Amino acid sequence: MVSWIISRLVVLIFGTLYPAYSSYKAVKTKNVKEYVKWMMYWIVFAFFTTAETLTDIILSWFPFYFELKIAFVIWLLSPYTKGSSVLYRKFVHPTLSNKEKEIDEYITQARDKSYETMMRVGKRGLNLAANAAVTAAAKGQGVLSEKLRSFSMQDLTLIRDEDALPLQGPDGRLQPGPVGLLDTIEDLGDEPALSLRSSTSQPDPRTETSEDDLGDKAPKRTKPIKKVPRAEPPASKTLKTRPKKKSSGGGDSA
């Protein structure tokens, strides 16, 4: 465990950070010799990192494995041994030069196939997502309609239960529950005379109180009202005509 931690620290510090800073200095100073040196190192270190991933799984049980890895990194980086330059010139550069065309073709094919695969997978993913959204919306609509239907049925049952429950009066006694509106209309339709009698038989509290108040108060004197004689129409004067007397002379002559 300790050797693994030490090897990781050596690889990170001496194998990655220090070469990165040296490459920065080479680019800044535009030193072609240093630039070529660190470019060869990074190519060799990339192959080392790829091989390390596999060997850590397969050969980690081997004795002094991590110590050998530390020594290899130092050998690559040391300016005395120049291990990275030796490996690049003897193994890496000849191999890449012989396989360069094949590697370029593989890279081009892989890029095209990966693009086509990505587009095909993307289309399938979009279709699946659209179908899933449609089915989820349909199921959700069905569930929502069922819930609304169940809620409406529950409300009706609750209203019926509330109508059936008796009410408790102020004296603690149970009173019958309120009659439904339809029942009251039916009762009124069956017995209209009874409803009218009950409405007319109730005394008006205002009239009772007013009569009692009038009985308590003393009667006030009222002035007698003089009767005005009616004006009779004037009687029409009748003219009396006296009868004419017969002349006495005429009688004597006869």
Swiss-Prot record:
Chain segments carrying region Disordered: 194-254
Ligase among keywords: no
Superkingdom in the source lineage: Eukaryota
Compartments it resides in: Membrane
Principal localisation: membrane
Disulfide bonds: none
Transmembrane feature ranges: 1-21, 35-55
Gene Ontology CC annotations of this record: cytoplasmic microtubule; endoplasmic reticulum; endoplasmic reticulum membrane; plasma membrane
Identification of the protein by name: Receptor expression-enhancing protein 2
Species, as recorded: Mus musculus (Mouse)
Gene name per UniProt: Reep2
